[in-house]
Amino acid sequence: MYPLVRRLLFLIPPEHAHKLVFAVLRGVAAVAPVRRLLRRLLGPTDPVLASTVFGVRFPAPLGLAAGFDKDGTALSSWGAMGFGYAEIGTVTAHPQPGNPAPRLFRLADDRALLNRMGFNNHGARALAIRLARHRPEIPIGVNIGKTKKTPAGDAVNDYRASARMVGPLASYLVVNVSSPNTPGLRDLQAVESLRPILSAVRAETSTPVLVKIAPDLSDSDLDDIADLAVELDLAGIVATNTTVSRDGLTTPGVDRLGPGGISGPPLAQRAVQVLRRLYDRVGDRLALISVGGIETADDAWERITAGASLLQGYTGFIYGGERWAKDIHEGIARRLHDGGFGSLHEAVGSARRRQPS
């Protein structure tokens, strides 16, 4: 059924299709009996999938990545779609329209997306109001970024303001310094710039704080950020954001689409490399959330055994449809049982621990 729906949706410009799907999901989730039925049909049921990460209980490891529900306007939908949690955002301290359209493109031959959305959102205060009214069925994380008009020199206060507004209402908070679509944002990944931002956010909230990084960092920069995260006692690292690399793309005309970040399978190999390096560096001292190019249960299992405590997806959901999260969770549960693991936690990093030193 979904392949037909996807073909029809792909006849519509991507951002319009996104809004249409959003309206349908919100409408369905607004009807409590329908929402409960969907959760019974699509939600995770095997208790082996549940885990406690940075003090938060997750019913299953695959969550909706930031960028899909930027303003938390479909908060009740994501548990019904089978996700174990959802990350809302990116939100900024001040509302902003983002970059001019067109700003979202399908790379169908690569099962990928190119976006240069530019943190379009209603602002952290509007999200805080929605979160305060919401009774979560699954954990809800919030991803915060820098307002475009805020100069880099005032980035600390900008992130602090967002953390103050949404931190107390979120299951966890992610500091996004890695989107390629806000000028100068990735420069904040340099340790000397990142340290005061993370320190300020940590001081502002008791909610677990993570940092989201780019896949395009050098290995030495990855090591520096990992060490800083441990030093500042962060809850974890989200790896990775979209890539600016165009290597290996097969979709015709991609060079004419302009700048932006690529998500989906073209990102997978680098996302795994980054995950493995981070896990080898920090071990169990930080929780690692792996995102980028996860399409199947095999992909998900590779990330878990490479060191990911949690997973996220966005592009895979668009191409995979309503059963995507369910199929991945069922595949993970099957591999846990077949491998003799008593819990998801036991499997995290198991492939790295077996490697000879």
Swiss-Prot record:
PROSITE patterns: DHODEHASE_1, DHODEHASE_2. It is found in: Cell membrane. InterPro entries: Aldolase_TIM (IPR013785), DHO_dehydrogenase (IPR050074), Dihydroorotate_DH_2 (IPR005719), Dihydroorotate_DH_cat (IPR005720), Dihydroorotate_DH_CS (IPR001295). SUPFAM superfamilies: FMN-linked oxidoreductases (SSF51395). GO terms for biological process: 'de novo' pyrimidine nucleobase biosynthetic process; 'de novo' UMP biosynthetic process; pyrimidine ribonucleotide biosynthetic process. It is a peripheral membrane protein. Keywords: Cell membrane, Flavoprotein, FMN, Membrane, Oxidoreductase, Pyrimidine biosynthesis. Substrate binds at residues 70, 115-119, 176, 181, 241-242. FMN binds at residues 66-70, 90, 143, 176, 212, 240, 264, 293, 314-315. Binds 1 FMN per subunit. It comes from the Bacteria. Pathway: Pyrimidine metabolism; UMP biosynthesis via de novo pathway; orotate from (S)-dihydroorotate (quinone route): step 1/1. It holds the Pfam family DHO_dh. NCBIfam families: PRK05286.1-2, PRK05286.2-1, PRK05286.2-5, pyrD_sub2. Belongs to the dihydroorotate dehydrogenase family. Type 2 subfamily. This is Dihydroorotate dehydrogenase (quinone). It comes from Mycobacterium tuberculosis (strain ATCC 25618 / H37Rv).
